[in-house]
Regions:
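A residue-level marker of the well-folded mature domains of exported/periplasmic proteins
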Residues: 2-9, 25-207
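Bacterial N-terminal signal peptides
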Residues: 10-21
């Protein structure tokens, strides 16, 4: 991991990617390949539209692939984006560990890689994200305002997503005092095998 940038907007992401690949922020005729982990989560559809708009606004060509929550498919997707002539890659990793072969392939081709939102443990990949621990704190503060006592159910994100741990750490920081005092009890702490709305609903119903 070369760099962590937190709380960044899509304009900054687009400029950063073009700067990494070309040395000039407003480079023209560059193709940026984006590998998305899945579009089951509505957020990624929104992010894609914003990212595509900003890259094209800066003169870059946008191409993408949806891994459909499949780590093997994501590796194939990245290889396909490379074959299509991308000059830089943005990867939202479905599995931060399993994506390693794709990073190695990009490195061999001399193609810069930016890990978007989810940490890729590879020194070749830059890392762009939000302050996920602070997001967890914000979530906990708002819930605590509404329910300062009682049983809490924590449904963490996918085990393949490092951000799930950061969010949970932030939540526990805010709630620790109340938990130590016995005002809040962690009745269940579950991690769905797949971070999709359907799996989350199943986990919630079992809690």
């Amino acid at each position: 991991m070369k760099k962590i940038l937190k709380g960044v907007g899509f304009t900054f992401i687009a400029v950063a990617v073009l700067t990494v690949v070309s040395g000039a922020a407003f480079a023209k005729s560059l193709t940026v390949g984006v590998s998305w982990s899945n579009f089951q989560e509505e957020r990624w559809k929104t992010d894609e539209a914003a990212m595509k708009r900003q890259l094209e606004k800066l003169g870059a060509k946008y191409i993408s692939a949806d891994a459909q929550a499949d780590s093997s498919k994501q590796i194939s997707d990245v290889e396909n984006l490379i074959a299509r002539g991308c000059d830089a890659l943005i990867i939202l990793a479905y599995d931060a560990d399993a994506i390693s072969p794709a990073i190695s392939r990009a490195k061999a081709e001399g193609i810069p890689v930016v890990g978007y939102d989810r940490l890729i443990e590879d020194p070749y990949a830059f890392y762009l994200t939000f302050d996920n621990k602070e997001v967890g704190r914000m979530q906990a503060r708002e819930v605590f305002k509404v329910k300062p006592e009682g049983n809490y159910v924590f449904i963490k994100g996918s085990p393949t997503d490092p951000n799930a741990d950061f969010l949970h750490e932030g939540q526990l920081e805010v709630l620790k005092e109340a938990m130590d005092a016995g005002k809040i009890k962690m009745s269940v702490s579950n991690t769905p095998m797949v971070g999709s709305p359907r799996s989350l609903k199943r986990t919630w119903s079992r809690s």
